[in-house]
């Protein structure tokens, strides 16, 4: 019997990608697989994302892992290259890059490359994290057009800061600014990630860049992915390794921060923060056991957590417990913990067994 296992449902992944295509039927899809495929396994996800037209990553090491694994579709470095020494690697491995700052632009201008690199100019349309500011935009465009190391036509992208908040005007303002700057440009454009894809159709343009929604996790605080017609790709499970009688007034776990108000049965599950399950999960965080949700009772430890099974529980050692996934949305668990589901799925450690099912 294995302890913590992340089961990756490749049929769910295929369903989600089909859903994405249906919501942006005239767009190309750049599946974002950074952070080890959002914790789902970089190479496995890429190999089974057959309908994707390209892949987006954050680190050059991720791009090289994809190439080494046989992925031949276009790959884009979403943050661009970190040093001029990366540029020959991009050329050798046919990796596209974002350019978002003067340092990257200067490095391209001064490099001696065998062949030009496909470049996406990132525009700061209002998030103010990365990108050429509107007043810098024309200068960047002119220099990139003149640079022999840049493949033509130049491409254009930006990123939303608040697309998951549907009652804010920020996304409309960002879209309008980006469109006004890039209107009439020859190259392809990309603006929408997961929330933009789902909620802001005016942002779809030539390419969409779905990330978290591909994995069946919602980008919105008030809607689960299932509500939106997507299936969870990851289901995280473990097993009960003990079922103990706990009397009213007895405390459980480190610090004794949960005290039973009744005689009950407490289940011990073989997963903890050493597996990436958050230590900060408070009492009451749900776990799914034998067809019902039961609450965490006591502090999460490195290798175990404890749940209140109830006084009449018939659960036994070896029974499966689902931490999140098909029977328990990761969004619901994240809300209890005070985080986002993105963090849950990307923080699993190497101790968790990965199983791919179809």
Curated annotation (Swiss-Prot):
What role does it play?
Answer: Catalyzes the interconversion of L-alanine and D-alanine. May also act on other amino acids.
Give the source's domain of life in one word. Answer: Bacteria
Mark the residues carrying the PTM N6-(pyridoxal phosphate)lysine: 34
Any idea of its EC number?
A: 5.1.1.1
* Reaction(s) catalysed (UniProt annotation): L-alanine = D-alanine
Pathway it works in? Amino-acid biosynthesis; D-alanine biosynthesis; D-alanine from L-alanine: step 1/1
One Gene Ontology molecular-function label: alanine racemase activity
Q: Which organism is it from?
A: Vibrio atlanticus (strain LGP32)
Protein family (similarity comment): Belongs to the alanine racemase family.
Q: Report what the protein is called.
A: Alanine racemase
